[in-house]
């Protein structure tokens, strides 16, 4: 069976979508190709890297990428992780499903916010896997 493709999108591909890609590969990797991107690129937030390292997931080699139309078109599911990405997501082909899983942006906030958002994203992906 061919793997399906899930594409996590947020504003800057800096925190939330990077953590979602890390968790997605860890939790869904057997059945899904997992990618992330942003409406813009802000660079991978070092605190997102550190938060994922704390749970033994290495995202230090991830890059902050703009939405790739080829990946977008071949995705089975696009998941927006913030309202900006949800509002500005490109028009999707009819075969691509879209869901919005909103998470607060931890950038510029306390360390505990990175941990909280990281753990919320993990829970959302675990629930998704059970569907």
From Swiss-Prot:
It is an enzyme of class 1 (oxidoreductase). GO terms for cellular component: cytoplasm. The keyword Disulfide bond applies. It is found in: Cytoplasm. It catalyses: arsenate + [thioredoxin]-dithiol + H(+) = arsenite + [thioredoxin]-disulfide + H2O. GO terms for molecular function: arsenate reductase (thioredoxin) activity; protein tyrosine phosphatase activity. Signal peptide: none annotated. Keywords: Arsenical resistance, Cytoplasm, Disulfide bond, Oxidoreductase, Redox-active center. NCBIfam families: arsC_pI258_fam, PRK13530.1. Belongs to the low molecular weight phosphotyrosine protein phosphatase family. Thioredoxin-coupled ArsC subfamily. Catalyzes the reduction of arsenate [As(V)] to arsenite [As(III)]. This is Arsenate reductase 1. The lineage of its organism: Bacteria, Bacillati, Bacillota, Bacilli, Bacillales.
């Amino acid at each position: 069976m061919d793997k399906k493709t899930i594409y996590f999108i947020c504003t800057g591909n800096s925190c939330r979508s990077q953590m979602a890609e890390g968790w997605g590969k860890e939790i869904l990797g057997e059945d899904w190709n997992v990618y992330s991107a942003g409406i813009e690129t802000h660079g991978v937030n070092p605190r997102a890297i550190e938060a994922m390292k704390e749970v033994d997931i290495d995202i230090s080699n991830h890059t902050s990428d703009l939405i790739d139309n080829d990946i977008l078109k071949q995705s089975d599911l696009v998941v927006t992780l913030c309202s900006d990405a949800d509002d500005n997501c490109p028009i999707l082909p009819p075969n691509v499903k879209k869901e919005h899983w909103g998470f607060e942006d931890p950038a510029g906030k306390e360390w505990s916010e990175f941990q909280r958002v990281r753990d919320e994203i993990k829970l959302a992906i675990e629930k998704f896997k059970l569907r």
